[in-house]
Swiss-Prot record:
Gene name as annotated: acpS
UniProt-listed InterPro entries: 4-PPantetheinyl_Trfase_dom, 4-PPantetheinyl_Trfase_dom_sf, ACPS, Ppantetheine-prot_Trfase_dom
Keywords carried by this UniProt record: Cytoplasm, Fatty acid biosynthesis, Fatty acid metabolism, Lipid biosynthesis, Lipid metabolism, Magnesium, Metal-binding, Transferase
Keyword check for Cytoplasm: yes
Enzyme Commission identifier(s): 2.7.8.7
Superkingdom of this protein's organism: Bacteria
The keyword Methyltransferase appears for this protein: no
Catalytic activity: apo-[ACP] + CoA = holo-[ACP] + adenosine 3',5'-bisphosphate + H(+)
Record-level GO BP terms: fatty acid biosynthetic process
Name of the protein: Holo-[acyl-carrier-protein] synthase
Function as written in the Swiss-Prot or TrEMBL entry: Transfers the 4'-phosphopantetheine moiety from coenzyme A to a Ser of acyl-carrier-protein.
GO MF, one example: magnesium ion binding
Amino acid sequence: MIIGIGSDICDIRRIETVLERHGERFLSRVFTTAERAKAERRNGRMRMGTYAKRFAAKEACAKALGTGFAGGVFMSDLGVVNLSSGQPTLRLTGGAAARLSAMTPSGMGAQVLLTMTDEYPYAYAQVVISAVPLPTSLIGGRGLP
């Protein structure tokens, strides 16, 4: 069952401009260490596209959470990570994780699906948050208090 959906488009040139003006301050406030490491392994437009896709993913996730960046949800609470298959997803911490927990129905788990793409000068991301049944071994006194 879908419980949240969000999308965002980001102008890569905007990220370039913000980085020129604010550099490290912007990077440390918006991106996780892992996101920064991934982007810094790339050059030129690929590096900017990597940052812009992750920026768009954070915006899309905030929309899917239904709060935007309010109610204790901050950009630093959202980090793009890759599953072992290479598929991107988001790791939520802090206020974002609390909001995700609050919006997930009892007895269900949350699944965060993410897709990202870029074609200069734009980056795009879409997030779908689904509530999925927990394995029965975790429900009803067989694993959960």
